[in-house]
């Protein structure tokens, strides 16, 4: 029977509960346990798919097509276990399910209430499908005291009572702020956070205290006394210089030992050699490359979380440090791109939606093509590269995307149908935004002898995760290929372009999918490893 670890947060938001959950999962996995990580989000949206990147950050897409919280990306990268739509739930989805059942008459006329109906739905979600796992780690979004989180806290309170003794542990992540004028760490915010938790019936077993310095023995004793936990269960969560150092930092602080002690379990010491190797490469690079990310949400780095990590993985694979130069694509829409891009070793244009900044991305693709600078276009970045080729190579000055409005030359258009397996999926042009994209893992057939096939080890078919409504128009394929832009990857039915590349360019690849979603520190995605390798070569030429 699985044991459950509930991770909650207090004092302030954005403390890193997702990263802490992922690191703890990795430590338990390194001890030989099988783990599952899940995220419970208290907001009323059905999923983050239609939420602004500036508010929510990245939407992480799973193989089965779920649009989920970015923390699931941390879970996958740290444990290697692919997440599914069953690993993320929101209040919106829970209410939708309950109201659907109510309309159907499933509740037989009962009055629908938060307790027991909402809390039971949350409990059912948490407990479902966990056979075969030793530990299930559940992160509760938000902070203790948030009104929307109360049903989730009540549900996990009940679960501990429902399970056999010793099968649930509460870990509370909190902040110990340092006050320079007083010269000391302050424990009072944590005491109040735990007091709030205890007022709703939850006594944390372990305090994971974020801090930038050592916790003095007196403060540790005070936290243990007033928060009603053992002093050994007050874990010092020191800031780390990179996220892949967190598992080793938390192990050194005793987090995994204390979790196992709370369950009354003993286990072999964790095998952290692979994590040690990753950190050795991060701390001892043999060079550095500069990559320009020409995006439209650069003011919110969390909008590109998986992309940042995938580039880091490419650097790890090549034993180099990857320096990121964030460039808002609007800045050179009406200017020459060269002054902004001449110093970089590679250009990456990521995904995005809408017309804002599109012309700047097209200019970035043109600069990379003409100057022979490595270029990686992802999703929207591929589409803009194709439009650039149509305008400046094929001679179609009005080439554009129908996403931006009516155009006489629709190089990129809205997909209204596509295949998933043997079934045809369709969408109305007037449909809602939510859930209307081509989402999840789809296969792509690669051309034999193409650069991209070589990067994938000679593979002729791959599977990658997608998130897009618009697609390059194959009606222009022959004309583009006549001018050197090769369509080296298509959907198996030959209808949807998946990959384009220039044969006479050091490294210029555009992909319609999101390879960053499948990159891991121990298994860097081959496209990112190859892109950074090309940037290393470019750095020696500049």
Curated annotation (Swiss-Prot):
InterPro entries: Class_I_gatase-like (IPR029062), CTP_synthase (IPR004468), CTP_synthase_N (IPR017456), GATASE (IPR017926), GATase1_CTP_Synthase (IPR033828), P-loop_NTPase (IPR027417). The keyword Thylakoid does not apply. GO terms for cellular component: cytosol. Residues 290-541 form the Glutamine amidotransferase type-1 domain. Allosterically activated by GTP, when glutamine is the substrate; GTP has no effect on the reaction when ammonia is the substrate. The allosteric effector GTP functions by stabilizing the protein conformation that binds the tetrahedral intermediate(s) formed during glutamine hydrolysis. Inhibited by the product CTP, via allosteric rather than competitive inhibition. Its EC number is 6.3.4.2. SUPFAM superfamilies: Class I glutamine amidotransferase-like (SSF52317), P-loop containing nucleoside triphosphate hydrolases (SSF52540). Pathway: Pyrimidine metabolism; CTP biosynthesis via de novo pathway; CTP from UDP: step 2/2. One of its GO terms (biological process) is 'de novo' CTP biosynthetic process. UTP binds at residues 13, 186-191, 222. L-glutamine binds at residues 54, 352, 380-383, 403, 469. Keywords: ATP-binding, Glutamine amidotransferase, Ligase, Magnesium, Metal-binding, Nucleotide-binding, Pyrimidine biosynthesis. CTP binds at residues 13, 146-148, 186-191, 222. Residues 1-265 are annotated as: Amidoligase domain. It catalyses: UTP + L-glutamine + ATP + H2O = CTP + L-glutamate + ADP + phosphate + 2 H(+); L-glutamine + H2O = L-glutamate + NH4(+); UTP + NH4(+) + ATP = CTP + ADP + phosphate + 2 H(+). ATP binds at residues 14-19, 71, 238-240. Transmembrane segments: none annotated. GO terms for molecular function: ATP binding; CTP synthase activity; glutaminase activity; identical protein binding; metal ion binding. CDD domains: CTPS_N, GATase1_CTP_Synthase. The active site is at 379 (nucleophile), 514, 516. Homotetramer. Belongs to the CTP synthase family. Catalyzes the ATP-dependent amination of UTP to CTP with either L-glutamine or ammonia as the source of nitrogen. Regulates intracellular CTP levels through interactions with the four ribonucleotide triphosphates. NCBIfam families: PRK05380.1, PyrG. CTPSs have evolved a hybrid strategy for distinguishing between UTP and CTP. The overlapping regions of the product feedback inhibitory and substrate sites recognize a common feature in both compounds, the triphosphate moiety. To differentiate isosteric substrate and product pyrimidine rings, an additional pocket far from the expected kinase/ligase catalytic site, specifically recognizes the cytosine and ribose portions of the product inhibitor. This is CTP synthase. The lineage of its organism: Bacteria, Pseudomonadati, Pseudomonadota, Alphaproteobacteria, Hyphomicrobiales.
């Amino acid at each position: 029977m699985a044991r459950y670890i509930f991770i909650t947060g207090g004092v302030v938001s954005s403390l890193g509960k997702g990263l802490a959950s992922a690191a703890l999962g990795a430590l338990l996995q390194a001890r030989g346990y099988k783990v599952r990580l899940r995220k419970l989000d208290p907001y009323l949206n059905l999923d983050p798919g239609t939420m602004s990147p500036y508010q929510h950050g990245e939407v992480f897409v799973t193989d089965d097509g779920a649009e989920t919280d970015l923390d699931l990306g941390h879970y996958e990268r740290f444990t290697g276990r692919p997440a599914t739509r069953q690993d993320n739930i929101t209040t919106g989805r829970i209410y939708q399910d309950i109201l659907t059942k109510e309309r159907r008459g499933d509740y037989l006329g009962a009055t629908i209430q938060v307790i027991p109906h909402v809390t039971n739905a949350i409990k059912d979600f948490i407990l479902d499908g966990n056979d075969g796992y030793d530990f299930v780690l559940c992160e509760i979004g938000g902070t203790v005291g948030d009104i929307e989180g109360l049903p989730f806290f009540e549900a996990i309170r009940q679960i501990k009572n429902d399970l056999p003794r010793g099968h649930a542990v509460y870990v509370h992540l909190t902040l110990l702020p340092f006050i320079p004028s007083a010269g000391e760490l302050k424990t009072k915010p944590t005491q109040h956070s735990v007091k709030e938790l205890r007022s709703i019936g939850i006594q944390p077993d372990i305090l994971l205290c974020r801090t930038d310095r050592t916790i003095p023995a007196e403060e540790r004793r005070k936290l243990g006394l007033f928060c009603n936990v053992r002093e050994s269960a007050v874990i010092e969560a020191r800031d780390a210089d990179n996220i892949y150092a967190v598992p080793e930092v938390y192990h050194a602080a005793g987090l995994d030992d204390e979790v196992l002690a709370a369950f009354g379990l003993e286990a072999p010491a964790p095998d952290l050699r692979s994590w040690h190797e990753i950190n050795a490469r991060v701390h001892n690079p043999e060079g550095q490359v500069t990559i320009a990310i020409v995006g439209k949400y650069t003011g919110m780095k969390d909008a590109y979380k998986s992309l940042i990590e995938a580039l880091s993985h490419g650097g790890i694979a090549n034993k180099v440090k990857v320096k990121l130069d964030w460039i808002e694509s609007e800045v050179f829409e009406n200017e020459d791109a060269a002054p902004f891009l001449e110093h970089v070793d590679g250009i990456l244009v990521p995904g995005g939606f809408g017309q804002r900044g599109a012309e700047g991305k097209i200019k970035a693709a043109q600069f990379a093509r003409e100057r022979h600078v490595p270029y990686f276009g992802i999703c929207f970045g591929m589409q803009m590269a194709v439009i650039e080729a149509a305008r400046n190579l094929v001679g179609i000055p009005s080439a554009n995307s129908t996403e931006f409005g009516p155009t006489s030359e629709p190089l990129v258009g809205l997909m209204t149908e596509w295949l998933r397996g043997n079934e045809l999926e369709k969408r109305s042009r007037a449909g809602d935004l939510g859930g209307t994209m081509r989402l999840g893992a789809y296969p792509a057939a690669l051309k034999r002898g193409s650069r991209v096939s070589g990067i994938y080890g000679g593979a002729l078919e791959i599977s990658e995760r997608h998130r897009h409504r618009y697609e390059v128009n194959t009606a222009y394929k022959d004309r583009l290929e006549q001018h050197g832009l090769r369509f080296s990857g298509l959907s198996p039915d030959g209808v949807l372009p998946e990959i384009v590349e220039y044969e006479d360019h050091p490294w210029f690849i555009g992909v319609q999918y999101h390879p960053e979603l499948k990159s891991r520190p121990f298994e860097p995605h081959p496209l990112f490893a190859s892109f950074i390798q090309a940037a290393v070569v470019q750095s020696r030429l500049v």
